Each structure stands twice: as structure tokens, then as C-alpha cells.
Amino acid sequence: MPKDSSEHQKSPSRFTRSMFVDPRAFVRRSVSPVDQLCHSVADLRFVSSNTETLESRLQALSKKFDNGSENHGQDTDTVEDVAKTQYMAKSFAGLIATASMYVGINELGDKEENDEDELELMNDAASVLDTSSQANQTLFEVSIEMNADAISQISTDSKSRKELIRERLIKKFLPNDDEKYIEEYPCWLLRDIMIQGHAYLTNKHLFFFAFIPNFESDFNVTGSLRLISGHVLSKSHRYWVVLKGHTLSFHNSSTDLYFPLLTIDLRDISSVQMTSSENNPTKFELSIKDQSLVLKADSFHSARHWVSSIKKQMFASQHSDTNTMTIKIPLQNIVDLEETSILDKSGTLRIKALENLSTYAVDEYFFVFFKGNANAMKQKVNSLLKDLEMNGSQILVNFNKVDSPLGINEKLPDLNYDDPSNENNLVDDADINSAETDTLSPGTMQSALTLQQTSSAFSPRHSAYPRKVKKKLKSMAGSLKLGSPSKFTKLEDDIIIEHYSPGLINDQTIDYDKDSKSIISRLTPKKFQNVPLMWAADPVHFNSDDGIVFPLDDKYTADADISNQSNVRFRQHFSFDETANLVASYHGYLNRNVPIYGKIYISDKNICFRSLLPGVSTKTVLPLEDVENCYKETRFRFGYFGLVIVIHGHEELFLEFGNKNARDDCEFVMIKVMDAVSSHRSTLKRKSTAEVVHRLSEAASLKLLEEKISEQGFDIPLIVEKNPYFTTVIKPSKSYKFGLLTIGSRGDVQPYIALAKGLQAEGHEVIILTHGEFKDWIVSHNIGFREISGNPAELISLMVQHGSMNMGLLRDASTNFSTWISSLLDTAWEGCQGIDILIESPSAMAGIHIAEALRIPYFRAFTMPWTRTRAYPHAFIVPDQKRGGNYNYFTHVLFENIFWKGISGKVNEWRETKLKLPKTNLVSMQQNRVPFLYNVSPIVFPPSVDFNEWIKVTGYWFLDEKRSYKPPAEFMEFLNKARELKKKVVYIGFGSIVVNDPEKMTDTIIEAVRDAGVYCVLNKGWSNRFGDPLAKKIDKELPSYIYNSGDVPHDWLFTKIDATVHHGGSGTTGASLRAGLPTIIKPFFGDQFFYASRVEDIGAGVALKKLNRSSLAKALKEVTTNTRIIQKARQIGESISKEHGVATAIGAIYSELGYARSLIKTKNPVDDKEMEAASTKLSNDAVVTAKGNEKEEYSSEGSGSNDGSWLLI
């Protein structure tokens, strides 16, 4: 056995046992700045013999590194790198990792003590990992209120339009002149879902009317799920899943959305429910006709959100024709009214109405009120019933003869909407948009949601609550259209109310279309038929009323019957709705890695492809709005004819045809269809910032609200009405105090200021905890500030002074870092007192422990890869070439162990003395289960398919400071001169880096700029020592084509130049990409290597491994002349400018808050009575403002609007 291995067996260290695999095979070839650190870890794993001291071993290692540093990172390019730094890492997180490792080395000798601690902590880990307990009540109390008019503030004109709509509805509702309108109540109809709408009372009828949202365009849920296949082995595969419109599609990754692996039409789903297994509470099942799909989410909260979203989408699909829902109940059929309480702080009116005279079946309707209107409506209905009886109207059923399935004094049963064994289902109302149809046949869609019976003695017709509606009610507003504000004046005339005929539905008689194909058969390709004809098939054109009309003499146009049949098959293949119209079809090849033979479809909305090869199920759905252009290529293969489709922000799509005429016709038709949709493209994509932000906030807040209702035992999705005149706002009813904890440089603090301003706009109080040097900056934005220790300048100075690892550095690090981290932990604990929610940069190290001690929700936020994934390596261990998923995942494991090894001693001591918590370890902390917000664009950092649901890539948190920067006159003259000479202007700046020869680096940049023939805005900050006050100055005279600008606001400068060269910090990279500038990155340390590779991967710039005259000049020419890079950077800039990172982050905080609360663990929980008291206090605080004054409720009874619908759960 090798000597190293035997020595390792004799004396294993605590650090060694925490590692999963031998790191030497992975990290020795790394060229990142942390490579030396990784080498030291690999070597320190093998403890020397008894005669060899630790100090002598470290001296040998230091000598090894000094000798090897000259050849470190060398390749065939032997040209020097003038930008080589004097120290290993300067990014703050990198410094922390390096310093923590140095400190951790001193603990390697304490084997017995370490073994005891490790054994104790591993025994504790099992109890901490139990996540099956119920989540505590969230800190958010959500209210729903009605804003002013959605178009503008409520005016007399808009009120008159609303009254005209009501009059139009009542006129259609009431065919008899003797029926009069009485009252209107804002309420929610409780069925499978809770639907916001209005209840209208007349002297003879009760109506419920609601506008159903059109989820086709504004509803989009994405995330990763596991699809479980097989019943015995239960194999599962992870996919990126997108719920949009009426389809649920599965993809390989978040960047491969044009090639769905599986598409499910929601109209084919008969039910969706959580599985009843207690061992797997994160699974849910989709029933698709006679099949079922089992999906698994990462958490119970995520699974519940997916089920809720799919249910709402299914309901909306059933009402997609009119986007409205109407129920009509004759008052004389009402047999009982009961006011009850289902949800906290709300009133519920249960109405039992006779359904059928022959069977005396009774239906139950539940109307939920949040303004005390339940009793008012009950009294009004009772009064109207008495009037009807006094006037001689016959009450069809004696109230006393109908047995109530649920007594007034009985306790409401717990709801279980996911029990498939119960047949008391709720059947949705059907809206029929047909002027010729006067009756409604029994429906065929079985409800996805079921209720659990409380007693087997109940009749099938008398469920607990809510019971199954045994008939389908025809829509009373068949063609009520939601148009743009300019069309509201004609909205009243479009309302068409139709009569209906009630009927019974027998569950056993429900059947489906026998001719419809199953999901599996749709994905199964047909065998070749008439292969010779298909090989050189002519195009086929299809005429439609709504699409392009081909001339009558067109030889390729199919007749009407074939067109109809082809349209039906086309919609079935790709799960499109009836609005999709096929324009043309072709046979050809999709050329990705290899040519795939199949059929190409062009519709009025999409370009599609379907493989015809046996065993190949490739499909493509490319929206026309994403297509920029198409053009002919001579050929990709001999004998074939090529067509290239240019996609916005995506690589091109290549098609091949065996027939030249087919290729030319496809190009012609494609351009015609693109021209037809081009006029609508701007309308489809142009949404105001306020509208997008509102939609993001609404979706997240609604998810939070549903979770709070679920905590009370009611798993009920909510649908908020899309009223054309009012918009419903869901927002926290109480201001809470957020603590944002971060340490580091100005670039580390800036995103938190942007997030703080967004949270303040939501009505919350925000405090940023960071270094004192940023106080004035933070306070200038009216944000709270608390100072903590941990300024990285001390560590930076320490690293620069020593340059490489040696015994002096180890001794200084052991002393300075220990004091530094102790001060940081203590001040962070003091600063976090009194906050309700903590968001922390993980480099601050203290947050996860403080949140545990304070028992508050905890989030992490960072700018670089910090969570385990196979898609990206850790930002500090980026290899010189891609090495695959195993290596990437291992880098995260390696870094976590290194990082924790260095700080664990101090942290555990601090936990015991200050926080009064027991010791912990990596397993007990569960830091990979913490909700994580990446403030990076998903274009630069696409979410990996193996990211858990609680990991969100939100987009950049830009801080657009409106400071009036006034450039010097000579600066503007320089820029104007460059434009006059038609010279490209580039920005070059690397921050305050420390290099060996700063003068030589300046000379190299000057020569490279001259060779490239561009003008340069230079921001010099490099020097040969840390903190040099003369770093910004240049001793020599600069040529006329270079201007030393110093620090200039990026949001001002980047709009006036053509390209950038910088070090690759997250903030600078985001600013240059948002401006649409080609970017050259010369990384020096930390996450800069990661962003250099990402910018090059997405085609927006160049990553420089070495900076010298030739390499920089070549890169400058490339980014200023290569049209492909320039166009790609511009496209990425347009996409990033449409992102709303702060709004997305706030939405993620809301949506993941319940999950964050469920992770709060402590080894010594508080007494149950204390918990109950805290919960009671929290509930009482729900209607109290931040100042402690009782919130005044706005009464709107009788107003007929929803501006008083407060929901305080």
C-alpha cells in the first residue's frame, strides 16, 4: 500500500472524514486562484509521521508552492500576463474561505476533541433533519383591497360604464319586466376553488357573476420536477416544467424551451391531487383519461403550489371562451340559508337550493364575505322570500322536510380535496358561447377535486361541504369580452345572456371521446408510409378565415375537408387550442446535432416540427414572435436545400429540404406569416413596468395567501377576478422589519440597497447591516443602517503583504482572523435584534445561526454560484476547461467543507456563549435547504434543472441612482471627437487591483488600444500595493485616443460607448450586459473567472486568460468588429432591460416565506403556552399598522364594488 495511504489510515483527521471523495484527483489541475488552497487541502489530508512536526510539513508545502508558482497555469502560450496579481484572492468571499482554511489548520492536531464533537453533532443531526412538522404561522397578514379604476382613477364616465354593464346584465338576467334589481354584494364563491366575484339580488333570483382571468398570456409557472416512472422500481427523471396557457410541458433544461419532451393538454386532465402517502408528501398525481402521471416536487409547499396552479389553470381553460362565469338561482328554490364561519375573520353564507323537482335533490352554494356582508345578504334574502310567500309565490319545498347534511352546531369537517375515493365532486359551470344553442347537455368533465366524507351514512346527494353540483349551469354572459380600455365604451353591448336547461349528471355515465388519442399515442411516431412520396413531397397550403388566404389558383392549396382534418391533427399533435390555424406544412429535416426527418408546420402563431422517424420523438414549438428572420442557405448536405431561422436571443434553427421548391415556398410563407404578426409583436411584448411588477407581486402574494388558508385546513386555490375597471391588490396588511446583512465591498452592498428600496415600496421597514464606511450612502436613500464589524480591508492587506502561503501568513491569519470573525459575529447578533425577516449574503456567515436563535424566516442572497449543482462549478474553483457535472458538484462540496472547517470553532463557541444554542455542523445547519435568491440575470446564470424549488434566479438588482453627473468638458470633447472620426469607444477598468508592475500594465494597454484602432476611456486603479492613494493617477502623458476618466457612473457612461473591458465583477458585468455592450473580461480572482466563462459562453464577449499587448488588441478588434458578438450583446441587453430583478426577488420572498418558516429549528423549543401566546399576539397584530393604531376598515356595503374586500387571515 502506498505510504500516503497507510499514514492516512493511522491518523485520520476530522476534516478528512467530512470529505466525500479524495480531492486530489479533481483539484490538482485547477487553474483558479483557489488552486493553491485546494492543493494545500489535498496534501494536508495525509498527516506526517510522528517525527515530522506540523510546522516542518507546512514549510515544505510553502516551498513547493513557491517553486510551482512560476509554471502555474502555463499552457502552449508562453507570453507573459502583465495583469498577474500579487495575491491569491481578493474577492471577499474568497478571502474568507482562504483565511478560514488557515485558521482551521491549527485545529487538525486536536483529534480527540474533534472526534467527540463530530460524534455528538452527527447524533444530533437526525432530529434536526426532520422536516415533517407543520410550518409556523407566517409573519405576513395579507389583505385584498380594490384599487382605483384600472384604467385611471374612478371618474364619472367609468362609473356610468360600470352601471351600464350591470344594467345590461340585469336586463339579460331578468326577462320579465316585473323583476327588479335589489342589491349587489362583493363576495367569493367557494367551490373546488375560491372565485372572486359579485352576487346580484333581484326580487326573484340570486345571481353570481365573475370575470375569469385569461391565463393564456399572463400566467406562467416554471420549475423543476421529477417525473416518476414505473411502479416497482419507481425511477424518476428531473425535468424543467412550464405551466403556461392550457399546457404543461416538460423540457431538458430552462434554456431548451423550444423543444418540449412532453406536452400535456390541461383539457385532457381529469383530476390533479396530492398523493395520500405520508412518506412522500411532495408527490402529486395527474389523471389523464385512463392514465396517470406521478410528479415529485422538492418540498410540500412546492407540490401544493403546483397542484393549486394546475387546478386554477384547468378551471380557466373551461371558461376560456368568454372569460366569465355566471350562476343563476331562483329564490323560490332556496330551501335554507345558514351563516357559518369557515375561514378566520370572514363570514360564509351557505345556501341550499332545490335542484330538481322530480328527485328533490338539493345543491349547496357557499358564498364567502370579508366585510360582514354575510348576515346582511342573509337578511335580505329572507326578506325577499317572505315577500314571495306573501305575494302567493309557491315555495317548492318545505324547509323542514329537507335534512341538513351538516347541522348548525356541528363542527365543520376537515377538508381533503385530494381524496380520490370520494365521489361527491364539484362540477364546474360551463360557459357556452353559442347564439344558436338554447339548452345545455350534461357535462363530461369530472372535477379534479374531491371532498372527504365525514360519515358513511350521508346520502350521495348530501355531502358535507361543499357538495357536488349535479348540473351544469350555462353561462349567462356568453360573449362578454375583456378588451383594451379604448374599447370599454362598447363593452356593454357585447354582453349576451343565454337561457339554460338544468340536468342531472350521473358520475357513472361520464365518458370521454373514444376517438381522442391518449398522451402516449400522441407521442408515438407513425411508421413510414409512402416513403418515396414523403421524401420529395410538395408543400401543402391551408386556407382559413383568420389566417393567410392563398389565391384560388394556388396549386398547393388543400380543399376545405382536408384543411379541417389537418387542423384537427395539428392541434392534437402539439396540444394547441382551437385558435391555432395551420397555414402550410412540409416534409424535411431539423438539423441539430444530426438531421432528423419529420414534418414542418407553419401556423398563424408558431413554427413547429414533429419527427416521423420511429423511436425519435423530437418536437419543436417556436413562437413566431421570437423569430427575427429566415434566409436560404445553399446546402448543409449534398443534394439538400437549407433554410436558416434566426431566433431572438437564441441560436439559429436549421432546416433542410429534399425539394428546392418546398424550401423556397417555406421561406416565402414564413416571411408572409411573420409580416402578418409583426404588427402585433410590439403589442404582445410591450408591457409597462408597473403592469409587470404588479403581475409578479400579485402571483407571489396570492401564493402566500393560499398557504395561509391551507394552514387552517383548507387546501383551496384562489382565483382573483380580472375586473376591467378595477384591479385587486394583494399586499401585506402590516409593515415588517427586514434585516439585510452583508459584508464586503461597495459592489456587495449596492444590490441590497436596490432590494431595500423595493421592500420599502411594499410598505416594509428595512435595515441594512454592514460596514460603517457605507453609512452615508445607505442613509442617503432613506434606508435604516446598523454598523457591524468585519471590514475586509484588514484581510486584504494581510493577503497582499504575504503574497503566498507561508508560515508568517499562517501565524498572522490565526491571530487576526480569529479576532476579526469574533467581532463580526458579535456585532451581527446585536444588530439583528428586533427584525422579523433576515436576508443575508452567505459570506457574512452569521445569519443562519442568528435566524435559528431568533426563530425568524431566513433567506440567502448572492451574486455567484453558492448552491450545489452539476451545472456550474463553484465560483472559486472554476477549472480552465469544462470537466462535467461530477466535478462541478464536487467543487461545492469541497468549498463548503473548507469554509466550515475554518469558522466552525469560533461559530460553535459563539453559539454556546452568545446565542445559547448547542453546537452544530454542516448536516445540522441544512444550509442547502435555505431559500436562496441569486441576483443575477437568468440569461447569464440560467437556473439549473437540479436547482431546488426554493432556489430562485431573480435577475440583477440594479440601483439606478439619479445622481446628476456632469462630465468634464474635455471628456465630452473626447467622446465627440471619437464619433466624428467614426472610431469605436471602449471602456477599460479593472478596479483597485494590485499587480507586480503597474507601469508596464499601463504601457501594454496603451499599445493594445493603438493596435486595435479604437478610442479608450480609461479608469486606472491598479498599483503595486494595496490602498495606494496614487493608484488612479498616471505619471506619463496619455495619447489623444485615451482619456483617463476616473470613476464614472456606469449607467451614464455605458450608454455612450461601444464595448467594455473589465475584471468581471457581478455588478459591472450586469451593467455592461444591460447596456448591450460586447464585454471583454480579464478575471483576477473569485467569481470573476466564472463570469468570464459565462459571458463567452452566451456569445456576448471574450474571456482573456492573459492580458498582454497582442491578446488585448485582438480581443478589442473582435468585440468592435464582429457583428455576431455585437448583435448578441444587443439582444441580451434588450432582454435584461425587460427583467425586473427586485420585483421578482420580492415575489420570491413572499412565495417562499411559508417554506422558510417551516425550516426554523431549535434544539430547545419554547413552551407550548408561550408559542400559543406568541401566535395569539401575531394574530391580533394583523389589523394593526406599524404605528400601532388600529386599522380602519373601509365600508363599501351597497356600493357594488370590490374595494372593501379585505382578507385578513
Swiss-Prot record:
Q: Where is the PH domain?
A: 218-315
Q: Which residues bind UDP-alpha-D-glucose?
A: S745, R746, D748, N1019, V1048, H1050, H1063, S1066, G1067, T1068, D1087, Q1088
Q: Which GO annotations describe the biological process of this protein?
A: carbohydrate metabolic process; lipid glycosylation; sterol biosynthetic process
| Intracellular or extracellular location(s) | Cytoplasm; Membrane
The reaction(s) catalysed by this protein are: a sterol + UDP-alpha-D-glucose = a sterol 3-beta-D-glucoside + UDP + H(+); ergosterol + UDP-alpha-D-glucose = ergosteryl 3-beta-D-glucoside + UDP + H(+)
Q: Which residues cross the membrane?
A: none
Q: What is its EC number?
A: 2.4.1.-, 2.4.1.173
Query: What is the protein name for this chain?
Result: Sterol 3-beta-glucosyltransferase
Organism of origin: Kluyveromyces lactis (strain ATCC 8585 / CBS 2359 / DSM 70799 / NBRC 1267 / NRRL Y-1140 / WM37)
Gene that codes for this? ATG26
